[in-house]
């Protein structure tokens, strides 16, 4: 006859990928790259250009024979370089202090950083056009742009856990996509194939 074999016990176990020890710094430290880039490029750009307005040198630069794009490039290139220096410093500290290595495509990481720097420089220019003093620029940059960038980007907690209206607003937040890229590259070993759409969304 047919011999019945008793079924064995089935046990389920949770398996946590990419951060099995549940250390908060592994999740938060890569995101500091995005936060630092936002602070350096957005605030310094808006303050530097508004300062030129206050002391009257911006008008003098405008009437010079240089073209407008040359003037803008001359003002923004130093902040692009400063942004890349900030990325290198944070990645170095992340490796030697927190023992977190970049597992994915480093070239894609720096290319994404460049795109994000361009987007925040644009926001800094936008702030400078609406500000007449450095104090106005600081207040506008921090309260109108930086706070939404941080709280709606998934920096501290997942966007998926937010109310639906905030999830809809987060679609226009460039830091959200940059954090997806940087966490994917550093923690998951991802690259261009997984995050090219996030890179396009930052434009």
Named regions from a protein language model:
Residues 1-44:
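Transport-system extracytoplasmic interface segments
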Residues 19, 32-36, 44, 48, ...:
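Residue-level hotspots within the lipid-embedded alpha helices of multi-pass solute transporters
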Residues 42, 74-98, 119-124, 128, ...:
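Hydrophobic alpha-helical transmembrane segments that constitute the membrane-spanning cores
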Residues 51, 60-68, 130:
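Short helix-to-coil transition segments within interhelical loops
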């Amino acid at each position: 006859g047919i011999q019945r074999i008793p079924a064995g016990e089935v046990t389920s176990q949770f398996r946590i990928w990419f951060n099995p020890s549940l250390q908060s710094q592994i999740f938060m430290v890569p995101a500091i790259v995005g936060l630092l880039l936002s602070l350096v490029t957005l605030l310094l750009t808006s303050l530097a250009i508004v300062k030129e307005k206050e002391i009257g040198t911006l008008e003098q630069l405008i009437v010079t024979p240089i073209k407008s794009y040359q003037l803008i490039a001359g003002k923004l290139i130093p902040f692009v370089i400063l942004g890349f220096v900030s990325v290198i410093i944070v990645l170095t500290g992340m490796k030697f202090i927190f023992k977190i290595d970049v597992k994915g495509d480093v070239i894609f990481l720096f290319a994404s950083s460049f795109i994000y720097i361009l987007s925040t420089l644009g926001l800094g220019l936008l702030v400078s056009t609406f500000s007449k003093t450095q104090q106005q620029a600081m207040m506008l940059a921090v309260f109108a742009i930086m706070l939404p960038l941080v709280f709606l980007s998934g920096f501290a907690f997942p966007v998926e856990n937010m109310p639906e209206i905030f999830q809809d607003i987060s679609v226009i937040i460039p830091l959200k996509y940059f954090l997806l890229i940087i966490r994917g590259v550093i923690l998951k070993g991802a690259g261009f194939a997984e995050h090219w759409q996030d890179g396009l969304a930052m434009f």
